[in-house]
Amino acid sequence: MSIDGRIAMKNGESRWITSKESREDVQKFRAKSSAILTSSATILNDDPLLNVRYKKFDKNTLSTFPKKIFQQPIRIIIDSKNRVKKSHKIIQTKEKILLMRLKLDKEIWPENTKQIIIKPYKENIDLLCVLKFLGNLEINNLWIEAGSTLSGCFLKLELIDEIIIYIAPKILGHEAKPLFIFNNQLKLFDCLKFDFKDIRQIGPDIRIKLEPKNKKF
């Protein structure tokens, strides 16, 4: 994100705010994860693959993730309105994908893609039920890469145990999209509080790790 807390321009343009070094660092966190979770909005806006670029790892990183035991993370997409289609790039990859939905569609999906029905919460997908479902699959290290709305929902529901932010030395202005969006306004007394756990420079950017003060996990 930018130093004024923005992750994309008003028109959705976001490539690239952070540096190549930061994007390479993200690959390591993806590789450590059992699964990567995103929203249908991110799929529609960016059409990402959300996999690990294993072939681009340097020797030191490859030693951490030996090819014999490395597995691509499962990709999980929160898709309450069935907006993800077979034409999206992520569906055309071979690794496993779970579409979290409120109802099935009539598409014939590739073998790697499964629709999972999750009960609703206020007309949206119940995120706590999603996490419980993933826990039953022994997915215990979940990496979330999503936009302002879904990320804000996870934070507001206190379902996050760590935040990792990459800050680029850029300013995008007040019309650009913020890092988090909450549906209801918080009073200062009720604001979400965090502890800094690690701060370091990654290329020209800064990476910050934070944990909630009242961590539940």
Swiss-Prot record:
Catalytic activity: 5-amino-6-(5-phospho-D-ribitylamino)uracil + NADP(+) = 5-amino-6-(5-phospho-D-ribosylamino)uracil + NADPH + H(+)
Entry keyword annotation includes Hydrolase: no
Pathway this chain belongs to: Cofactor biosynthesis; riboflavin biosynthesis; 5-amino-6-(D-ribitylamino)uracil from GTP: step 3/4
Keywords: NADP, Oxidoreductase, Riboflavin biosynthesis
EC number: 1.1.1.193
Binding site for substrate: S14, R30, L50, R53, E145
Name of the molecule in the record: 5-amino-6-(5-phosphoribosylamino)uracil reductase
